[in-house]
Amino acid sequence: MSKSTAEIRQAFLDFFHSKGHQVVASSSLVPHNDPTLLFTNAGMNQFKDVFLGLDKRNYSRATTSQRCVRAGGKHNDLENVGYTARHHTFFEMLGNFSFGDYFKHDAIQFAWELLTSEKWFALPKERLWVTVYESDDEAYEIWEKEVGIPRERIIRIGDNKGAPYASDNFWQMGDTGPCGPCTEIFYDHGDHIWGGPPGSPEEDGDRYIEIWNIVFMQFNRQADGTMEPLPKPSVDTGMGLERIAAVLQHVNSNYDIDLFRTLIQAVAKVTGATDLSNKSLRVIADHIRSCAFLIADGVMPSNENRGYVLRRIIRRAVRHGNMLGAKETFFYKLVGPLIDVMGSAGEDLKRQQAQVEQVLKTEEEQFARTLERGLALLDEELAKLSGDTLDGETAFRLYDTYGFPVDLTADVCRERNIKVDEAGFEAAMEEQRRRAREASGFGADYNAMIRVDSASEFKGYDHLELNGKVTALFVDGKAVDAINAGQEAVVVLDQTPFYAESGGQVGDKGELKGANFSFAVEDTQKYGQAIGHIGKLAAGSLKVGDAVQADIDEARRARIRLNHSATHLMHAALRQVLGTHVSQKGSLVNDKVLRFDFSHNEAMKPEEIRAVEDLVNAQIRRNLPIETNIMNLEAAKAKGAMALFGEKYDERVRVLSMGDFSTELCGGTHASRTGDIGLFRIISESGTAAGVRRIEAVTGEGAITTVHADSDRLSEVAHLLKGDSNNLADKVRSVLERTRQLEKELQQLKEQAAAQESANLSSKAIDVNGVKLLVSELSGVEPKMLRTMVDDLKNQLGSTIIVLATVAEGKVSLIAGVSKDVTDRVKAGELIGMVAQQVGGKGGGRPDMAQAGGTDAAALPAALASVKGWVSAKLQ
């Protein structure tokens, strides 16, 4: 009996654990500290800084099953998903890694043993082929002489991409940096499937399938293209779980493995589909994996960046459900079956199941409102199409108005053998982005480009000032040896008390100084293992190697500490008041305010906000000790420590405890006792995305300031109402009731005046071919009264056409009324459109009643004068 996908995953990890590898949990799908990546798309992403020498681990061998997403950006497989055997938006990458430990010999031997040993995967050796880089004789000889693969099944692949080292079998992280040859292992499904071995003209067939890529990082590529040997070569491997599962389960398509068969059956059940071969089932089965895990990792549907990619995938799935005949929201119902089929890899998802389901349901409901209208518009455009390409402007309009991602439009078009002008769509999108950039005023961030080879030691938990040495200087992202007064720069020290922004806590401010210089620090950021002090040299000069005294702004740090500690108390209080589904989705802690985003599906009630405030202030009054302990990550989680969203943790972590009330992993700076916080007040609660709420709060002196401000406002209101704070509510109710009564009386007077005005106007109507035409500009009449006047006049005049206008604050308001017996010849919407166009506006409505607005009041007399001629022509 073949292994299940879950068993294959576990067997891989168990095998490498038996070979001395540390089993490392999958990292988040949101890459940590890597702005070059939209999503985690390979197993090595979480070890990138280790390979670059910027990070160190307490192990030299690791193995993972890494969750990955490829949709959007460079790795955009979305349009192929569901239509081919092996394209996915979400997949798991099995990998083993050596950080300067073993190299080619062991890497190849490990792979061969796992794949062919009867104890493990037991694949037939004669079905396995390998490729090596053309000049990698070492790997070739290991495969031939040590493993024993015949020469005819070892294929050398050269530079097949038009440049030196540009090859399927040569891997590089970028234009410079670690790189090296790789060897790939292929499985031969047999001659009953079309295709040829790698490197042959038929290599794109499905007979020979790549199952494992083993990268040998042995060079450091220089800017001039030369390859310098790395002092400690490393290994990075990747094997797609879905691919190896297909091989081990003896199926040719990833969608036929047990995991997908189960999901496809679940999709059929919730949509009512009966044909299990329908490709829409495969699309939805794939998409629920990426969508659910992205939401669990903190991504929310939106119109930009990662959130937009998520929205595109959700909407593509919903549209395919629509094609299958789904009559109600269905997508969120697949989260439970997904958790079941993922086994141990679904534990993180299970903890957030309710939140993930709610986000998916809300997003589907919102899109369902526009899906039908958008599809109808697309059908209209395709019906008018004379060629075989839909223009980019139309595709953009569908996106902009109805929320149709271009790949969803392309899906519909592909079903009718129509292409989409994606270049035209991108041009329209880029124009929108350009306008957005100009509106935002943001420029380039040179600091984000900085790469620092050195490391800084943070000593700010115990020191607010200390002496350090400058190890690097950067100006506009470029390394320099010295800076002079007036220059803005990033200064890196060997040790520093300055806290670099992390975990939602902002970076410290302060001063770096010496006998002859002063550098004002406005922010502190991390660059790999280095800490950069961002600011401006106020006086003197500063060079690499100089000694400095680093002094943080102590008062500011103290306020930040209070706010950060209060954030932990509030997180725990929210979980007690609202439920344990609450988890952090983002935070900001500075010296003025704390901002906390958390999972919750509805606005907090006033009594819930008060309960959270009361609970936090109760812990402040308890004056609990705030204690820090360093322990292993797994031990911390076993203790119940909550991990913060978006943070990357080492194997050894700081566990912050506040008595028996709160325990979290945190690297930030904190008060000594909860009593130091003084007072906690929530100043706002709002929504930021589907299923995500945001609280802003203040502490200490900031909280006292808000109390005084509230008191001052109440005193001012009491003074204005000639009362005092004790009976203020009664006074306000009395004033509001009196105001409502006066407004009602005023409205009655306006209606009486309008009726009188209507009676006066009726005598001004003229006869045009048997129809009474009344055109008039009114003064002192509110725009909203025009409709009432038109109704009155239609009752008085019988067969009639009426156009009334008024000007208020420079804006023109227009209304046209046409009695029903005349609408076959004159339509109010066309009439009002003709007038509105002349006054710089537009409008519309029914054939018997239409309204419009305009901005050119000076053109109104001429516009009204044109009505008689236009109507006469229509009535002839």
Swiss-Prot record:
GO biological process: alanyl-tRNA aminoacylation; negative regulation of DNA-templated transcription
InterPro entries named in the record: aa-tRNA-synth_II/BPL/LPL, Ala-tRNA-lgiase_IIc, Ala-tRNA-ligase_IIc_anticod-bd, Ala-tRNA-synth_IIc_core, Ala-tRNA-synth_IIc_N, Ala-tRNA_ligase, Ala_tRNA_ligase_euk/bac, DHHA1_dom
Cofactor: Zn(2+)
Binding positions (Zn(2+)): 564, 568, 666, 670
Gene Ontology CC: cytosol
CDD domains registered for this protein in UniProt: AlaRS_core (cd00673)
EC nos: 6.1.1.7
Residue positions where N6-acetyllysine is found in the record: 74
Enzyme superclass (EC): ligase
Cofactor mode of binding and number, as noted: Binds 1 zinc ion per subunit.
Recorded GO MF terms: alanine-tRNA ligase activity; aminoacyl-tRNA deacylase activity; ATP binding; tRNA binding; zinc ion binding
Keyword Isomerase: no
Subcellular location: Cytoplasm
Keywords: Acetylation, Aminoacyl-tRNA synthetase, ATP-binding, Cytoplasm, Ligase, Metal-binding, Nucleotide-binding, Protein biosynthesis, RNA-binding, tRNA-binding, Zinc
UniProt-listed SUPFAM superfamilies: Class II aaRS and biotin synthetases, Putative anticodon-binding domain of alanyl-tRNA synthetase (AlaRS), ThrRS/AlaRS common domain, Translation proteins
The reaction(s) this protein catalyses: tRNA(Ala) + L-alanine + ATP = L-alanyl-tRNA(Ala) + AMP + diphosphate
Predominant localisation class: cytoplasm
Domains: entry comment: Consists of three domains; the N-terminal catalytic domain, the editing domain and the C-terminal C-Ala domain. The editing domain removes incorrectly charged amino acids, while the C-Ala domain, along with tRNA(Ala), serves as a bridge to cooperatively bring together the editing and aminoacylation centers thus stimulating deacylation of misacylated tRNAs.
Role, per record: Catalyzes the attachment of alanine to tRNA(Ala) in a two-step reaction: alanine is first activated by ATP to form Ala-AMP and then transferred to the acceptor end of tRNA(Ala). Also edits incorrectly charged Ser-tRNA(Ala) and Gly-tRNA(Ala) via its editing domain.
Family: Belongs to the class-II aminoacyl-tRNA synthetase family.
Matches recorded under HAMAP family: Ala_tRNA_synth_B
Assembly description: Homotetramer.
Name of the protein in its database record: Alanine--tRNA ligase
Name of encoding gene: alaS
